[in-house]
Design a protein with these regions (language model features):
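Flexible, low-complexity linker and terminal segments
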Residues: 2-23, 150-294
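Thiamine diphosphate
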Residues: 2-153, 158, 179-181, 245-250, ...
Protein backbone atom coordinates (compact mmCIF):
# COMPACT_ATOMS: atom_id res chain seq x y z
CA UNK A 1 0.00 0.00 0.00
CA UNK A 2 1.50 3.40 -0.95
CA UNK A 3 2.10 6.01 1.68
CA UNK A 4 -0.91 8.23 2.27
CA UNK A 5 0.93 11.40 1.32
CA UNK A 6 1.37 10.00 -2.20
CA UNK A 7 -2.40 10.08 -2.60
CA UNK A 8 -3.14 13.49 -1.12
CA UNK A 9 -0.26 15.63 -2.44
CA UNK A 10 -0.70 17.08 -5.91
CA UNK A 11 3.00 17.39 -6.81
CA UNK A 12 4.76 14.28 -5.57
CA UNK A 13 8.13 15.26 -6.99
CA UNK A 14 8.18 18.61 -5.19
CA UNK A 15 6.81 17.75 -1.75
CA UNK A 16 7.09 20.27 1.05
CA UNK A 17 4.70 18.54 3.44
CA UNK A 18 2.97 15.21 3.90
CA UNK A 19 0.26 13.66 6.05
CA UNK A 20 2.40 10.92 7.56
CA UNK A 21 2.18 8.10 10.03
CA UNK A 22 4.63 8.60 12.88
CA UNK A 23 6.82 5.75 11.67
CA UNK A 24 6.74 7.14 8.12
CA UNK A 25 7.86 10.49 9.50
CA UNK A 26 10.75 8.80 11.32
CA UNK A 27 11.71 7.05 8.09
CA UNK A 28 11.69 10.35 6.26
CA UNK A 29 13.80 11.92 8.99
CA UNK A 30 16.35 9.13 8.61
CA UNK A 31 16.59 9.78 4.87
CA UNK A 32 16.80 13.56 5.28
CA UNK A 33 19.60 13.21 7.85
CA UNK A 34 21.94 11.61 5.31
CA UNK A 35 21.90 8.17 6.90
CA UNK A 36 23.97 5.50 5.11
CA UNK A 37 22.78 2.26 6.75
CA UNK A 38 19.53 1.19 8.40
CA UNK A 39 18.81 -2.27 9.79
CA UNK A 40 15.69 -3.45 11.61
CA UNK A 41 13.72 -6.39 12.91
CA UNK A 42 9.92 -6.15 12.55
CA UNK A 43 7.54 -5.84 15.48
CA UNK A 44 4.59 -3.60 16.27
CA UNK A 45 4.73 -0.66 16.78
CA UNK A 46 8.06 -0.21 14.94
CA UNK A 47 7.62 -2.15 11.68
CA UNK A 48 6.61 0.72 9.41
CA UNK A 49 9.93 2.51 9.96
CA UNK A 50 11.75 0.10 7.66
CA UNK A 51 8.77 -0.30 5.34
CA UNK A 52 8.68 3.46 4.80
CA UNK A 53 12.45 3.57 4.30
CA UNK A 54 12.11 1.09 1.44
CA UNK A 55 9.58 3.38 -0.25
CA UNK A 56 11.53 6.57 0.42
CA UNK A 57 14.69 4.95 -0.96
CA UNK A 58 12.91 3.97 -4.17
CA UNK A 59 11.03 7.25 -4.55
CA UNK A 60 14.05 9.49 -3.95
CA UNK A 61 16.65 7.16 -5.50
CA UNK A 62 18.55 7.36 -2.22
CA UNK A 63 21.77 5.31 -1.75
CA UNK A 64 20.96 4.17 1.82
CA UNK A 65 21.60 0.47 2.53
CA UNK A 66 18.53 -1.22 4.07
CA UNK A 67 18.30 -4.59 5.80
CA UNK A 68 15.66 -6.68 7.53
CA UNK A 69 17.95 -8.47 9.97
CA UNK A 70 17.48 -11.96 11.40
CA UNK A 71 17.01 -10.49 14.91
CA UNK A 72 17.43 -7.25 16.81
CA UNK A 73 20.99 -8.00 17.94
CA UNK A 74 22.09 -8.46 14.34
CA UNK A 75 20.25 -5.28 13.34
CA UNK A 76 22.01 -3.29 16.05
CA UNK A 77 25.44 -4.73 15.25
CA UNK A 78 24.96 -4.03 11.53
CA UNK A 79 24.21 -0.40 12.28
CA UNK A 80 26.97 -0.18 14.88
CA UNK A 81 29.53 -1.59 12.46
CA UNK A 82 28.64 1.12 9.96
CA UNK A 83 28.98 3.73 12.70
CA UNK A 84 32.45 2.48 13.61
CA UNK A 85 33.47 3.09 10.00
CA UNK A 86 32.19 6.67 10.27
CA UNK A 87 28.78 6.36 8.61
CA UNK A 88 25.48 7.58 9.98
CA UNK A 89 23.36 4.55 10.79
CA UNK A 90 20.09 3.45 12.37
CA UNK A 91 18.82 0.30 14.07
CA UNK A 92 15.04 -0.01 14.55
CA UNK A 93 13.05 -2.41 16.75
CA UNK A 94 10.28 -2.58 19.33
CA UNK A 95 11.04 -2.32 23.02
CA UNK A 96 11.31 -6.05 23.76
CA UNK A 97 13.74 -6.26 20.86
CA UNK A 98 16.19 -4.17 22.83
CA UNK A 99 16.34 -7.08 25.28
CA UNK A 100 17.79 -9.18 22.45
CA UNK A 101 20.22 -6.44 21.43
CA UNK A 102 21.14 -5.42 24.98
CA UNK A 103 24.53 -7.16 25.13
CA UNK A 104 25.84 -5.21 22.15
CA UNK A 105 24.00 -2.03 23.09
CA UNK A 106 25.42 -1.89 26.62
CA UNK A 107 28.94 -2.38 25.31
CA UNK A 108 28.47 0.24 22.58
CA UNK A 109 27.57 2.85 25.19
CA UNK A 110 31.04 2.37 26.72
CA UNK A 111 32.95 2.11 23.45
CA UNK A 112 31.16 5.01 21.80
CA UNK A 113 30.66 5.68 18.10
CA UNK A 114 32.29 7.43 15.14
CA UNK A 115 29.41 8.15 12.78
CA UNK A 116 26.08 9.05 14.35
CA UNK A 117 24.17 6.01 15.63
CA UNK A 118 20.45 6.28 16.36
CA UNK A 119 18.55 3.35 17.87
CA UNK A 120 14.81 3.67 17.24
CA UNK A 121 13.01 1.66 19.93
CA UNK A 122 9.21 1.84 19.82
CA UNK A 123 7.49 1.34 23.17
CA UNK A 124 4.05 -0.22 23.54
CA UNK A 125 2.35 0.92 26.75
CA UNK A 126 -1.00 -0.77 27.03
CA UNK A 127 0.21 -3.16 25.71
CA UNK A 128 -1.43 -3.45 22.29
CA UNK A 129 0.86 -6.00 20.65
CA UNK A 130 3.55 -6.96 23.14
CA UNK A 131 4.22 -9.33 26.01
CA UNK A 132 5.35 -6.54 28.38
CA UNK A 133 4.99 -2.79 28.90
CA UNK A 134 8.66 -2.16 29.57
CA UNK A 135 9.89 1.41 29.36
CA UNK A 136 12.97 1.91 27.18
CA UNK A 137 13.96 4.98 29.20
CA UNK A 138 15.04 2.62 31.97
CA UNK A 139 17.31 0.81 29.50
CA UNK A 140 18.84 4.17 28.59
CA UNK A 141 19.46 4.85 32.27
CA UNK A 142 20.94 1.36 32.64
CA UNK A 143 23.30 1.80 29.68
CA UNK A 144 24.06 5.48 30.40
CA UNK A 145 22.79 6.58 27.01
CA UNK A 146 20.66 9.61 26.13
CA UNK A 147 17.09 9.07 24.93
CA UNK A 148 14.81 11.41 22.98
CA UNK A 149 11.08 11.04 23.67
CA UNK A 150 8.88 12.59 20.92
CA UNK A 151 5.27 13.56 21.52
CA UNK A 152 4.08 13.84 17.90
CA UNK A 153 5.00 12.42 14.46
CA UNK A 154 6.42 15.80 13.38
CA UNK A 155 8.56 15.99 16.50
CA UNK A 156 9.72 12.41 15.97
CA UNK A 157 10.96 13.31 12.48
CA UNK A 158 12.78 16.41 13.72
CA UNK A 159 14.35 14.47 16.58
CA UNK A 160 15.99 12.02 14.17
CA UNK A 161 18.38 14.72 12.94
CA UNK A 162 18.82 16.02 16.48
CA UNK A 163 19.70 12.49 17.61
CA UNK A 164 22.36 12.14 14.91
CA UNK A 165 23.88 15.48 15.85
CA UNK A 166 23.86 14.58 19.53
CA UNK A 167 25.44 11.20 18.79
CA UNK A 168 28.25 12.75 16.76
CA UNK A 169 28.84 15.62 19.18
CA UNK A 170 29.30 13.36 22.20
CA UNK A 171 30.26 10.13 20.39
CA UNK A 172 27.51 8.03 21.99
CA UNK A 173 24.61 5.95 20.65
CA UNK A 174 21.31 7.80 21.07
CA UNK A 175 17.91 6.21 21.61
CA UNK A 176 14.78 7.57 19.95
CA UNK A 177 11.74 6.31 21.86
CA UNK A 178 8.44 6.81 20.04
CA UNK A 179 5.44 5.19 21.74
CA UNK A 180 2.63 3.46 19.87
CA UNK A 181 0.48 6.59 19.96
CA UNK A 182 3.25 8.46 18.17
CA UNK A 183 4.20 5.62 15.80
CA UNK A 184 0.63 5.08 14.60
CA UNK A 185 -0.69 8.65 14.74
CA UNK A 186 -0.87 10.80 11.61
CA UNK A 187 0.10 14.44 11.29
CA UNK A 188 1.06 17.02 8.69
CA UNK A 189 4.85 16.88 8.56
CA UNK A 190 7.22 19.30 6.83
CA UNK A 191 9.57 17.64 4.36
CA UNK A 192 13.05 18.73 3.29
CA UNK A 193 15.54 17.50 0.70
CA UNK A 194 17.82 14.69 1.93
CA UNK A 195 21.31 15.63 3.02
CA UNK A 196 24.16 14.06 1.04
CA UNK A 197 25.37 10.69 2.27
CA UNK A 198 29.02 10.96 3.29
CA UNK A 199 31.36 8.12 2.30
CA UNK A 200 32.50 6.63 5.59
CA UNK A 201 35.80 5.33 4.32
CA UNK A 202 37.71 2.36 5.79
CA UNK A 203 37.45 1.25 9.39
CA UNK A 204 40.30 2.59 11.55
CA UNK A 205 41.65 0.06 14.01
CA UNK A 206 42.07 1.09 17.64
CA UNK A 207 42.23 -1.94 19.90
CA UNK A 208 42.30 0.06 23.14
CA UNK A 209 38.86 1.36 22.26
CA UNK A 210 36.99 -0.89 19.82
CA UNK A 211 38.35 -4.12 21.34
CA UNK A 212 38.97 -2.78 24.82
CA UNK A 213 39.92 -5.19 27.59
CA UNK A 214 38.61 -4.54 31.15
CA UNK A 215 41.58 -2.33 31.98
CA UNK A 216 40.59 0.13 29.26
CA UNK A 217 36.87 -0.26 29.98
CA UNK A 218 37.49 1.57 33.24
CA UNK A 219 38.87 4.50 31.26
CA UNK A 220 35.93 4.36 28.85
CA UNK A 221 33.46 4.31 31.74
CA UNK A 222 35.05 7.46 33.16
CA UNK A 223 34.84 9.11 29.74
CA UNK A 224 31.18 8.11 29.42
CA UNK A 225 30.37 9.69 32.77
CA UNK A 226 32.12 12.87 31.63
CA UNK A 227 30.07 12.89 28.41
CA UNK A 228 26.84 12.57 30.40
CA UNK A 229 27.86 15.43 32.65
CA UNK A 230 28.65 17.57 29.60
CA UNK A 231 25.24 16.75 28.14
CA UNK A 232 23.54 17.76 31.37
CA UNK A 233 25.20 21.18 31.10
CA UNK A 234 24.41 21.59 27.40
CA UNK A 235 21.87 24.42 27.35
CA UNK A 236 20.52 23.42 23.94
CA UNK A 237 19.61 20.01 25.32
CA UNK A 238 18.47 21.07 28.77
CA UNK A 239 16.01 23.70 27.54
CA UNK A 240 12.47 22.27 27.51
CA UNK A 241 9.95 23.05 24.80
CA UNK A 242 7.18 25.45 25.73
CA UNK A 243 4.05 23.96 24.23
CA UNK A 244 1.21 26.03 25.67
CA UNK A 245 0.17 28.13 28.61
CA UNK A 246 1.09 31.24 30.53
CA UNK A 247 4.54 31.69 32.01
CA UNK A 248 3.01 33.63 34.91
CA UNK A 249 1.09 30.55 36.02
CA UNK A 250 1.50 29.20 39.52
CA UNK A 251 1.22 25.60 38.34
CA UNK A 252 3.37 23.90 35.71
CA UNK A 253 2.86 20.48 34.22
CA UNK A 254 6.03 18.78 33.00
CA UNK A 255 5.30 16.00 30.54
CA UNK A 256 7.32 13.70 28.31
CA UNK A 257 6.59 11.93 25.06
CA UNK A 258 3.18 10.72 23.97
CA UNK A 259 1.58 11.52 27.34
CA UNK A 260 1.92 15.20 26.42
CA UNK A 261 -0.98 14.87 23.98
CA UNK A 262 -3.21 13.37 26.66
CA UNK A 263 -2.31 16.14 29.09
CA UNK A 264 -3.09 18.80 26.48
CA UNK A 265 -6.51 17.20 25.91
CA UNK A 266 -7.25 17.21 29.64
CA UNK A 267 -6.13 20.82 29.99
CA UNK A 268 -8.36 21.91 27.11
CA UNK A 269 -11.35 19.89 28.31
CA UNK A 270 -11.08 21.56 31.72
CA UNK A 271 -11.02 25.00 30.13
CA UNK A 272 -7.46 25.72 31.21
CA UNK A 273 -5.78 25.97 27.83
CA UNK A 274 -4.11 29.18 26.65
CA UNK A 275 -4.00 30.70 30.11
CA UNK A 276 -7.76 30.49 30.78
CA UNK A 277 -9.07 29.99 34.28
CA UNK A 278 -11.82 27.61 35.35
CA UNK A 279 -13.42 26.50 38.62
CA UNK A 280 -11.33 29.02 40.53
CA UNK A 281 -8.03 27.29 39.70
CA UNK A 282 -4.92 29.01 38.45
CA UNK A 283 -4.14 28.74 34.77
CA UNK A 284 -1.72 26.05 33.74
CA UNK A 285 1.62 26.41 32.04
CA UNK A 286 2.26 23.25 30.01
CA UNK A 287 5.79 22.25 29.14
CA UNK A 288 7.20 19.24 27.43
CA UNK A 289 10.51 17.67 28.37
CA UNK A 290 11.87 15.51 25.57
CA UNK A 291 15.24 14.26 26.73
CA UNK A 292 16.37 12.02 29.53
CA UNK A 293 19.92 11.35 30.67
CA UNK A 294 21.28 8.57 32.80
Amino acid sequence: MPLLYEKVMAHENDLQAGFLLGNEAIGRGIIEAGCSVAAAYPGTPSSEVMESLVRWKKKLDHPIYLEWSINEKVAFETAYGASLAGARSVAAMKMVGLNVASDSFMSAAYLGVRGGLVVVVADDPGPHSSQTEQDTRFFAWFAKAPVLDPSTPAEAKDMVLRAFELSEKYLVPVLLRPCLRVCHARQNVSLAPPRPVVDAGPFKKNWTRWAAIPRYRLVLHKELNEKLEAMRKDEALARPYLVAGNTDSKLALITSGSVSSHVRDIVRSDGLADGDMAAGRDCICLWQSSMALA
